[in-house]
From Swiss-Prot:
Oligomeric and partner information: Homomer.
The reaction(s) this protein catalyses: GTP + H2O = 7,8-dihydroneopterin 3'-triphosphate + formate + H(+)
PROSITE patterns: GTP_CYCLOHYDROL_1_1 (PS00859), GTP_CYCLOHYDROL_1_2 (PS00860)
Pfam family, one: GTP_cyclohydroI
Protein name, UniProt field: GTP cyclohydrolase 1
Gene3D superfamilies with a match to the protein in the record: 1.10.286.10, 3.30.1130.10
Taxonomic superkingdom: Bacteria
Entry's Gene Ontology molecular function annotations: GTP binding; GTP cyclohydrolase I activity; zinc ion binding
Biological source species: Corynebacterium aurimucosum (strain ATCC 700975 / DSM 44827 / CIP 107346 / CN-1) (Corynebacterium nigricans)
Signal peptide: none
């Protein structure tokens, strides 16, 4: 896969706990006070879950297909996604819309697999643009989809709670592959279904 990420290491709970403890000290907190005593361990457990996608492969998610001889659009809309901005390590969240036309063999994947694929890539330090492209590319590379469209709409807390402080602003990204990229009418039809 073209994930452009370095070789994977297992999550190091001990190191993560130590880092959170040091961060608390760096911001002027006492990590030994009652309310924070368990925080390094809790944050390490949370990050193990939040970044679990680093240790997953899209072929594992999309390996099961069904021979339906379906050559028309499959679209799953309004998939909730939660990710972490790699620049500030704060959340961004919103919805993903994933559509594809199966490959010439007509094989489709389970609908839940599209949501799992979005989750897998979202559970990494991310930028929304890459997240959108990774989902689209996986559908082409693993499922051999003829056409793919992925649209993601998110609010970024790095824009809402710091810096420019614009809560409610949303960012929309899209990735279009295959026939949808070449055929403006087909692309417009899918976009109208996403917006309906």
């Amino acid at each position: 896969m073209s994930d452009n990420i370095p070789a994977q290491r297992e999550f190091d709970h001990e190191r993560a706990e130590a880092a959170v403890r040091e961060l608390l000290i760096a911001v002027g907190e006492d990590p030994d006070r009652e309310g924070l005593r368990e925080t390094p361990a809790r944050v390490a457990r949370a990050y193990a879950e939040v970044f679990a996608g680093l240790h997953q492969d899209p072929t594992e998610v999309l390996h099961k297909t069904f021979a339906e001889e379906h050559q028309e659009l499959v679209l799953v809309r309004d998939i909730p996604i939660y990710s972490t901005c790699e620049h500030h390590l704060v959340p961004f969240y919103g919805t993903a819309h994933i559509g594809y036309i199966p490959g010439t063999d007509g094989h489709v994947t389970g609908l839940s697999k599209l949501a799992r694929l979005a989750d897998m890539y979202a559970k990494r330090p991310q930028v929304q643009e890459r997240l959108t492209s990774q989902i689209a590319d996986a559908l082409v590379e693993v499922l051999h989809a003829q056409s793919v469209i992925v649209v993601i709409e998110c609010e970024h807390l790095c824009m809402a709670m710091r810096g420019i402080r614009k809560p409610g602003a949303t960012t929309t990204t899209s990735a279009v592959r295959g026939g949808f990229k070449k055929n403006a009418a087909s692309r417009a039809e899918v976009m109208s279904l996403i917006r309906s």
